[in-house]
Curated annotation (Swiss-Prot):
Binding site for S-adenosyl-L-methionine: N10, L12, G36, E57, D81, N98
Catalytic reaction equation(s): adenosine(1518)/adenosine(1519) in 16S rRNA + 4 S-adenosyl-L-methionine = N(6)-dimethyladenosine(1518)/N(6)-dimethyladenosine(1519) in 16S rRNA + 4 S-adenosyl-L-homocysteine + 4 H(+)
GO MF annotations in UniProt: 16S rRNA (adenine(1518)-N(6)/adenine(1519)-N(6))-dimethyltransferase activity; RNA binding
Compartments where located: Cytoplasm
Name of this protein: Ribosomal RNA small subunit methyltransferase A
HAMAP family recorded: 16SrRNA_methyltr_A
Keywords: Cytoplasm, Methyltransferase, RNA-binding, rRNA processing, S-adenosyl-L-methionine, Transferase
UniProt source species: Mycoplasmopsis pulmonis (strain UAB CTIP) (Mycoplasma pulmonis)
Major localization class: cytoplasm
Gene Ontology CC annotations of this record: cytosol
UniProt-listed InterPro entries: KsgA/Erm, rRNA_Ade_diMease-like_C, rRNA_Ade_Mease_Trfase_CS, rRNA_Ade_methylase_Trfase_N, rRNA_adenine_dimethylase, SAM-dependent_MTases_sf
Alphabetized Pfam families for the sequence: RrnaAD (PF00398)
Length: 252
């Protein structure tokens, strides 16, 4: 069965990487959601260790293969787009996924939106995206994605993954990252906060003040900079994560 470009399919064939994903995912006796199981290389191990595996697969051809190959009683195959699912809030899950790169951000924001039921997620992502998610203050890759993910999750790099670990071979390397939900975080304003970050990073060449002043009170911004000892010409990528959220609360 050939991979389909429209679904962003690249099948993981490296057993060492598969084992690292499973070992880092804390799947033992847990409820697991797998996004895009494909031919089931990862799924076959998950069903042996997890309490229950819910696998979301939108490709009917892959669904047919999985139904033939996996008959475990704790395996539930759902022929549906994960992004369109309305989840039962009474259950808790860990997520494990080798996700299509073109919907990485969408999946992460779906996880944030459903934070009540997702404790952690182990994700295979494009190496470039992993660097952006893991980036720290003053890094060139530091972005709204870095801030939004790191505010709600502790983020860990599990391993780098060569493009040769997939078939067909993609053009870029990948990385496995793990997101662990932070305790006692207020998720209620996450959509509003992300809209704020989009404005803050709308032009990386401009100062943060110039990006924000047409939408928020300029004097409040300058007063905040003075309080936190930031230069008025500071750029968005040079602001600490916790200070960004404090500024957001001050201006909203």
């Amino acid at each position: 069965m050939r991979a389909k470009k429209r679904f962003g399919q690249n099948f993981l064939i490296d057993q060492n990487i598969i084992n690292k994903i499973v070992d880092s995912s804390e799947v033992e006796n847990r409820n697991i959601i797998e996004i895009g199981p494909g031919k089931g290389a990862l799924t076959k191990i998950l069903v042996k260790k997890a309490n229950k595996v819910l696998a979301y697969e939108i490709d009917q051809d892959m669904v047919n293969i999985l139904n033939q190959q996996i008959s475990s009683k704790n395996f539930v195959l759902i022929n549906k787009d994960f992004l369109k699912e309305e989840f039962d809030k009474s259950q808790n899950y860990n997520i494990v996924a080798n996700i299509p790169y073109y919907i990485t951000s969408d999946i992460i924001f779906k996880i944030i939106e459903n934070h009540q039921i997702f404790d952690q997620a182990t994700l295979m992502v494009q190496k470039e995206v992993a660097l952006r998610i893991l980036a720290k203050q003053n890094d060139s890759e530091f972005s709204k994605l870095s801030l939004s993910v790191q505010f709600f999750f502790d983020v860990f790099l599990i391993c780098d993954v060569s493009k040769n670990s997939f078939r067909p071979i993609p053009k870029v390397d990948s990385a496995v990252i793990k997101l662990v939900k932070k305790k006692n975080k207020d998720f209620s304003l996450w959509k509003e906060y992300f809209e704020f970050l989009k404005i803050a990073f709308s032009s990386r060449r401009k100062t943060l003040l110039n990006n924000l002043k047409y939408f928020f009170n300029e004097q409040k911004i300058l007063k905040f900079f003075e309080l936190k000892n930031y230069d008025p010409k500071v750029r968005a990528q040079n602001i600490k994560n916790e200070d960004f959220y404090a500024l957001f609360l001050e201006l909203r």
